[in-house]
A protein has these predicted regions:
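A short glycine-rich, Lys/Arg-flanked "PGG" loop and its adjoining helix->strand segment in the class I
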Residues: 132-147
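Class I SAM-dependent methyltransferase SAM/SAH-binding core
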Residues: 54-56, 60-108, 133
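A short acidic, Gly/Pro-enriched loop at the edge of an enzyme's catalytic core
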Residues: 106, 110-119
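A short SAM/SAH-binding and catalytic strip from SAM-dependent methyltransferases
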Residues: 118-131, 154
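A structural alpha-helix within SAM-dependent methyltransferase catalytic domains
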Residues: 42, 65-68, 135-139, 166
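Conserved class I S-adenosyl-L-methionine
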Residues: 2-51, 62-66, 86-89, 93, 149-175
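Conserved Class I S-adenosyl-L-methionine
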Residues: 7, 11, 15, 60-62, ...
Length: 277
């Protein structure tokens, strides 16, 4: 599916703010903590040699490449992401059992029913404004008894970067350009996740809240992470000159959080494994 064929879901973040710079930043930044959390999620999911696995919201393909090694030559991994620039980077990771396509979680039309043993979504679910359609699509492409693994932001646990950014954006002159709802995330809590599983054909085998620690070496690194991981939506609603000012203000306020080890955020992450009924 080409990028021009993607269907925008009401309230979803913009896909037009990504850039080569942000995509390469994301490749570099996600190679540490986010990739490691994805590796742990693959363990929770119990990925086995010979299985067919869908990495939904695969980004630049680091986790998909790792899973391709886990499933081995008799298995298969397909990575799907709505951002063409990130899929372009992902396709540089060449494996005979690994492929990537531009597409979105709401419309997996290119994938056949009951064609996967497992689906993994790492750091993706909180971007969906409407949750049931992606879960129903996952249920459709999974075989009966197939597993879905989700690692996502826990509701009510925003990073310090986003807390400070929200305060800055509520002040003049930035408040003249309110951030669209589509440029915010849509996290859930454990009970909401359980309910979503139940209504979309999954039995929960694991729903767990885990402690999570993030560290950024500098205020600039924290801002760049937020921009890259949000594919430009972090401050993308501001005119260019105000975006520069907002970045400078956020950077200045983040400086007060610096320790000898950098800016440290202790948060919580929601991990869920569902089995298709």
């Amino acid at each position: 599916m080409g990028a021009g064929n993607l269907r925008v879901v009401d309230g979803a973040p913009s896909l037009s703010l990504d850039s080569d710079e942000l995509a390469h930043d994301y490749e570099r930044i996600s190679a540490t903590r986010q990739f490691q959390s994805g590796q742990r999620l693959a363990v929770d999911l119990g990925v086995l040699p010979g299985e067919c696995v869908l990495d939904l919201g695969c980004g630049t393909g680091l986790l998909a490449e790792h899973i391709a090694d886990l499933v081995g030559p008799h298995g298969k991994v397909v990575g799907i992401d709505p951002l063409p620039l990130r899929i372009e980077l992902a396709r540089s990771k060449r494996r005979a059992n690994l492929s990537f396509e531009v597409g979105d979680a709401y419309h997996l039309d290119m994938l056949e029913d009951s064609s996967f043993d497992a689906v993994i979504m790492n750091a993706v679910f909180h971007w969906f404004p409407e949750k049931t359609r992606p879960l129903l699509e996952c249920a459709r492409v999974l075989r009966p008894g197939g597993r879905l693994g989700i690692g996502t932001v826990l509701k009510g646990h925003r990073t310090r970067v986003h807390q400070i950014a929200s305060k800055v954006l509520a002040e003049p002159p930035f408040d003249r350009f309110p951030r669209p709802r589509a440029q915010l995330t849509f996290p859930v809590d454990a009970e909401e996740m359980r309910a979503f599983f139940e209504m979309t054909g999954f039995s929960a085998s694991l729903i767990e809240v885990r402690e999570s620690t993030r560290m950024w070496p500098s205020p600039e690194a924290a801002i760049r992470f937020s921009e890259a991981s949000s594919f430009g939506n972090f401050l993308g609603h501001l005119p260019p000159e105000l975006k520069i000012r907002a970045r400078a203000t956020i950077r200045q306020r983040l400086q007060s959080l610096m320790t000898a080890d950098g800016i440290i955020h202790h948060g919580r992450r929601l991990v869920a494994i569902g089995v298709r009924r």
